[in-house]
Amino acid sequence: MKWIGLTGGIACGKSTVSRMLRTHDIPVVDADEIAKEVVKPGSAGLKSVIQEFGPEFLTADGALDRRKLGQKVFGHPELLHKLEAITHPLIREETRRRRRLYEDMGHKLAIYDIPLLFETRAKDQFDGVIVVACTKEQQKERLRRQNWSEDEIEMRIASQIPIQFKEQQADFVLHNNRDEQHLLREVDRVLKWLEELKNQN
């Protein structure tokens, strides 16, 4: 089974593209979804995170306050490393399980929706990489609409590898810098490319 990475800069529209691909019966494994699952209430992952960082990162209903924890660790490499040392092995294990499941079902191709594909040096694990790209100003505007502060926006964008580098490293670049009709046409281009990949030995 071909294993395709889907990534992009924050707020470039990767999740929207991921949803569109699902509607075409392409199996998608979502790294963010798995990252939430491995620290859900009652999980061993959540217990380990709280032991490391403290109970102030729990919400009133016992869930992990991901935004509060994110604000603490971003910009502090040693804290981010501690968090990733807990969560990354759990995420990898669950990812492998889902990938095997799709393979056992007979799929020829599956997508792994992973925001930090290049940051985690994972490119070599894939048979192809799709990058969803937009301009920096569009990233900022979309994050403002989600009520992010200017400091949060600057810090998060700065923590990621520049989108231009990701575009250079990609096997396929999908531009999400115009309207929805343009995005639909871009997704059609991706679907054709995936079909070609699927039929390669």
From Swiss-Prot:
Keywords: ATP-binding, Coenzyme A biosynthesis, Cytoplasm, Kinase, Nucleotide-binding, Transferase. It catalyses: 3'-dephospho-CoA + ATP = ADP + CoA + H(+). Transmembrane segments: none annotated. InterPro entries: Depp_CoAkinase (IPR001977), P-loop_NTPase (IPR027417). GO terms for biological process: coenzyme A biosynthetic process. Its main location: cytoplasm. GO terms for cellular component: cytoplasm. Pathway: Cofactor biosynthesis; coenzyme A biosynthesis; CoA from (R)-pantothenate: step 5/5. ATP binds at residues 11-16. One of its GO terms (molecular function) is ATP binding. Pfam families: CoaE. Coiled coil: none annotated. Belongs to the CoaE family. Catalyzes the phosphorylation of the 3'-hydroxyl group of dephosphocoenzyme A to form coenzyme A. HAMAP family: Dephospho_CoA_kinase (MF_00376). This is Dephospho-CoA kinase. It comes from Bdellovibrio bacteriovorus (strain ATCC 15356 / DSM 50701 / NCIMB 9529 / HD100). The gene is coaE.
